[in-house]
Amino acid sequence: MGGLSIWHWLIVLLIVALVFGTKKLRNIGNDLGSAVKGFKDGMREGEAPADPQQLPRSGSVNVDAKDATRSSDSNKA
């Protein structure tokens, strides 16, 4: 009595189909499926490692050269 049997779910499905119509339900199903597919594709893109060649080079600083300059400046003083 507490659980819902298959007959209860079939009756609920029939009522929903009558209220909304099968075309509207099909559109909702397509929208939901494409949203799930887009989410999965987005998760796959996030997991893929970025190629080092594709990363932009932006103002990298050579730390060793900077330290060498500081030590030569302190020797002059």
From Swiss-Prot:
GO CC, one annotated term: TAT protein transport complex
- GO BP of this protein: protein transport by the Tat complex
Q: Where are the transmembrane segments?
A: 1-21
Q: How does it sit in the membrane?
A: Single-pass membrane protein
Composition bias of kind Basic and acidic residues appears in 64-77
Its domain of life?
Answer: Bacteria
The record's subcellular locations are: Cell inner membrane
Where is the stretch described as Disordered?
40-77
Q: Does the keyword Cell cycle apply?
A: no
Tell me which UniProt keywords the record has, alphabetically.
Cell inner membrane, Cell membrane, Membrane, Protein transport, Translocation, Transmembrane, Transmembrane helix, Transport
Q: State any single GO MF term.
A: protein transmembrane transporter activity
What S-S linkages are listed for this chain?
A: none
Q: Which family does it belong to?
A: Belongs to the TatA/E family.
- Assembly behavior: The Tat system comprises two distinct complexes: a TatABC complex, containing multiple copies of TatA, TatB and TatC subunits, and a separate TatA complex, containing only TatA subunits. Substrates initially bind to the TatABC complex, which probably triggers association of the separate TatA complex to form the active translocon.
Q: Which HAMAP family match?
A: TatA_E
PANTHER family for the chain = SEC-INDEPENDENT PROTEIN TRANSLOCASE PROTEIN TATA (PTHR42982:SF1)
Its annotated function is as follows: Part of the twin-arginine translocation (Tat) system that transports large folded proteins containing a characteristic twin-arginine motif in their signal peptide across membranes. TatA could form the protein-conducting channel of the Tat system.
> NCBIfam families this protein is in?
PRK02958.1 (NF002813), tatAE (TIGR01411)
What name does this protein carry? Sec-independent protein translocase protein TatA
The source organism is: Burkholderia thailandensis (strain ATCC 700388 / DSM 13276 / CCUG 48851 / CIP 106301 / E264)
Give the taxonomic lineage as stored in the record: Bacteria, Pseudomonadati, Pseudomonadota, Betaproteobacteria, Burkholderiales
**Gene name linked to the record:** tatA
